[in-house]
UniProtKB/Swiss-Prot annotation:
PROSITE patterns: KARI_C, KARI_N. Pathway: Amino-acid biosynthesis; L-isoleucine biosynthesis; L-isoleucine from 2-oxobutanoate: step 2/4; Amino-acid biosynthesis; L-valine biosynthesis; L-valine from pyruvate: step 2/4. Mg(2+) 2 binds at residues 193, 229, 233. Signal peptide: none annotated. Residues 185-329 form the KARI C-terminal knotted domain. Its EC number is 1.1.1.86. Substrate binds at residue 254. This is Ketol-acid reductoisomerase (NADP(+)).
Length: 330
């Protein structure tokens, strides 16, 4: 691997166990991280605003809940596990004014720091600890004595605590050292994560799926078959890729499927490459971040419109019917 990678044997869990951790937010990541930390014998409190719907849940799970500014004053490490677009507002009002030299502020994504939405005072550490998976998977893997890959990065050193040692120890407490903790930078994590979401995992994949579905529908094929071939079977392929890689996927599909993929890969790739380069450029030069923060300031008009429109599409309507048996089994 090109990146430095650390495992449990390389990391001192005692570093994070000696500190008081405060987690701001109790969504999927906040809950999973807090539970994993507590099970790793780490002292952790939760910071939420008065009236937050998450307060009863956090208290029911045995955590002490404080207002954010109180949490900051009583913590050595403060983890900001909030949506990216809320970091500037919350940290400028409730966190930064109460920070002291030697404390560390942690993030699960580099967006707000890399794009200068959050600038921490000198002497306050800035670390990134990013589990490569959703909160549900982070918790499930920990309970199975396994873990997810984690990324760490150091943007600013603390005047009191070694920021890298704290980041590594935090990742170990969440189970990351069981799989591997890779060291990167805020810039690399942020830009590659945004690119992956936009060009492949969310934007690119959804675009190809919906385009494939609509192509078959317009050609007169039944909606059910279009859904099976363009949506339903994506999981089968994704699982093969996840566990066996591209070569392993090739070995598990038919010769017909493999030949068809190879034959059409180049023309499709040529079309996608230029678009992907444009996507990456807009991420790198900050124009995507600017557009996203403007969307937030206007109360998400485009997101709300798109979400409403998606419910009315054929792909969602037939999908809801075909997914019903799977959801019923849960």
């Amino acid at each position: 691997m090109a990146l430095p990678v650390y495992y449990d044997k390389d990391i001192d869990l005692g570093v994070i166990q000696s500190l008081q951790v405060g987690i701001i937010g109790y969504g999927a990541q906040g809950e999973a991280q807090a539970l994993n930390l507590r099970d790793s014998k780490v002292k952790v409190r939760i910071g939420l605003y008065q009236g937050s719907l998450s307060v009863p849940k956090a208290k029911a799970e045995g955590f002490e809940v404080l207002e954010v500014k109180e949490l900051v004053q009583q913590s050595d490490l403060i983890m900001a596990l909030l949506p990216d677009e809320l970091h500037k507002e919350v940290l400028e009002k409730e966190v930064i004014p109460f920070l002291k030299e030697g404390q560390i502020v942690g993030f699960a994504h580099g967006f707000s720091v890399h794009f200068n939405q959050v600038v921490l005072p000198k002497g306050v550490g800035a670390i990134l600890v990013a589990p490569k998976g959703p909160g549900s998977a982070l918790r499930e893997e920990y309970l199975k004595n396994r873990g997810l890959y984690h990324l760490i990065a150091i943007e600013q050193e603390s005047s009191k605590n070694n920021a890298k040692a704290v980041a590594l120890s935090y990742a170990k407490a969440m189970g990351g050292g069981r799989m591997g903790v890779l060291e990167t930078s805020f810039k690399e994590e942020c830009e590659s994560d945004l690119f992956g979401e936009q060009a492949v995992l969310c934007g690119g994949l959804e675009a190809i799926i919906r385009m494939g579905f609509e192509t078959l529908i317009k050609a007169g094929y039944p909606e059910e078959l279009a859904y099976f071939e363009c949506v339903h079977e994506v999981k089968l392929v994704a699982d093969l890729l996840h566990y066996k890689g591209v070569e392993g996927l090739r070995k598990h599909i038919s010769n017909t499927a493999e030949f068809g993929a190879i034959k059409n890969r180049e023309p499709m790739g040529n079309l996608l490459e230029k678009r992907m380069q444009k996507i990456l450029k807009k991420i790198q030069n900050g124009s995507f971040a600017k557009d996203f923060l403007l969307e937030k300031s206007l109360n998400y008009p485009r997101l709300n419109t798109e979400r409403k429109a998606l419910k009315e599409t054929k792909i969602e309507q037939i999908g809801e019917i075909l997914r019903a048996p799977f959801n019923h089994k849960k």
